[in-house]
């Protein structure tokens, strides 16, 4: 068996022979990471990515200075989508070790689920994986309902049914109830709604290959809110929370939805489809209607919704939208506590009116006259939230997935957002 490479921390600069910008050095005892007090967690994560790039697959984090956040930063950079990596962790107190184990279980589940090929992860498989994860942490307090295929149409989940009907794999709505109170009439504190498009071809508004090749990850919002609920439970969540995952493929077939179709929703809204590649908002609408019907204090939806958010923020931040300044501030405070990147983008009342249609109340995409695509998408969703000005957060999760490796991340899913939402739920 190969001996593990020792990784130690130092606050002293590297030997001058390594250069004045060296973040790590190598000697007979292993590899030393040289912390300088300027973004030490980022330095550790970037160094871990380089260590993985050297082909070193077994490491031991040894010596002084390894707390849970530094351990986690190392793992975030070290983990990749190919191969097996082994880490011997330093001694941590019981609470920190339990927290680390929970992160390794749940956030790695999120990353691995998002990275899974679409052929292996259809709508029903995604819903079942979510159930399995939540049952693994709180099965006694979890009940759920899976509605799929024609049952969705019969129960008037028209957005989800319309988008998903073009695939041989039936669309699915997962409605899961985490109720630790033991009281079936307990109020619902929060609802989480996730976009679970397990593959997005764009439909008849078809994507180019360069934009389609990562679309197995278009269920990143659903995976992240599922992980967030599971992680919040491990941190002691004692309030009732409901989870709604809107899962479908968006494919082309003789039964696929078309431009000019009109979708009539249960809340009375009707929407003209002018871009089948703006499908995420169409499925989320059904989940948000259900969430609003619970009258919770808090609704959070999460979706890989727009290219516009990526244009604004790259893959480095999740985009946050809300009419509720106080709640948005709480989310950003949670993000800061968890060292996760969120950035608030504009959402104003006028964005709700920038989706005009000649044939319906709403259009599912903005015209060239209204180019703020991420904000108009959030405005669209607000029409399906009963009290949209209070208690609602929309997260356009640009940072869930990277098509190519960068200094601090391997290609693929990041798991970012799980801890922030869990923090907010348990605050």
From Swiss-Prot:
The entry's localization annotation reads: Cytoplasm
* Record-listed Mn(2+) 1 binding positions: 200, 277, 279
Name the InterPro entries on file: Leucine_aapep/pepB, M17_PepB-like_N, Pept_M17_PepB, Peptidase_M17_C
**What is the first-listed, main subcellular location in coarse terms?**
cytoplasm
Query: Which GO MF terms does the UniProt record name?
Result: manganese ion binding; metalloaminopeptidase activity
Family as reported in the entry's similarity comment: Belongs to the peptidase M17 family.
List the NCBIfam families: PRK05015.1
| Protein name as catalogued | Peptidase B
Taxonomic source organism: Salmonella arizonae (strain ATCC BAA-731 / CDC346-86 / RSK2980)
């Amino acid at each position: 068996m190969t001996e593990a490479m020792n990784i130690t921390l130092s606050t002293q600069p590297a030997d001058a022979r390594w250069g004045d910008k060296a973040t790590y050095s190598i000697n007979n005892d292993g590899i030393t990471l040289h912390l300088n007090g300027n973004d030490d967690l980022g330095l550790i994560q970037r160094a871990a990515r380089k260590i993985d790039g050297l082909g070193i697959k077994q490491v031991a984090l040894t010596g002084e200075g390894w707390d849970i956040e530094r351990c986690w930063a190392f793992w975030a950079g070290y983990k990749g989508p190919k191969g097996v990596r082994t880490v011997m962790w330093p001694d941590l107190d019981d609470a920190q070790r339990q927290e680390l184990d929970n992160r390794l279980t749940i956030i790695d589940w999120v990353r691995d689920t998002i990275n899974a090929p679409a052929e292996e992860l259809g709508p029903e498989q995604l819903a079942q994986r979510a159930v399995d994860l939540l049952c693994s942490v709180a099965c006694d307090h979890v009940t759920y309902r899976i509605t799929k295929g024609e049952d969705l149409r019969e129960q008037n989940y028209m957005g989800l049914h319309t988008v998903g009907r073009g695939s041989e794999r039936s669309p699915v709505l997962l409605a899961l109830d985490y109720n630790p109170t033991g009281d079936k009439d307990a109020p619902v504190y929060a609802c989480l709604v996730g976009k679970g498009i397990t593959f997005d071809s764009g439909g008849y508004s078809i994507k180019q290959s360069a934009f389609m090749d990562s679309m197995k990850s278009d269920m990143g919002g659903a995976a992240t809110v599922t992980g967030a609920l599971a992680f919040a439970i491990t941190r002691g969540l004692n309030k009732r929370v409901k989870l709604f995952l809107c899962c479908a493929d968006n494919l082309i077939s003789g039964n696929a939805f078309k431009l000019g179709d009109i979708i009539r929703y249960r809340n009375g809204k009707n929407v003209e489809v002018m871009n089948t590649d703006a499908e995420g908002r169409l499925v989320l609408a059904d989940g948000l209607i259900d969430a609003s019907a619970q009258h919770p204090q808090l609704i959070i939806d999460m979706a890989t919704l727009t290219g516009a958010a990526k244009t604004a923020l790259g893959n480095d931040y999740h985009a946050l939208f809300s009419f509720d300044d106080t709640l948005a501030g709480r989310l950003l405070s949670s993000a800061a506590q968890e060292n996760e990147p969120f950035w608030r983008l504009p959402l104003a009342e006028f964005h709700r009116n920038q989706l005009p249609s000649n044939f319906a109340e709403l259009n599912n995409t903005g015209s060239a006259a209204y180019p703020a695509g991420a904000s108009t998408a959030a405005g669209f969703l607000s029409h399906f939230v009963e009290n949209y000005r209070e208690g609602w957060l929309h997260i356009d999760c640009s940072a869930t997935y990277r098509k190519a490796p960068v200094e601090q991340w391997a290609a693929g899913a990041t798991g970012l957002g799980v801890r922030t939402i869990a923090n907010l739920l348990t605050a």
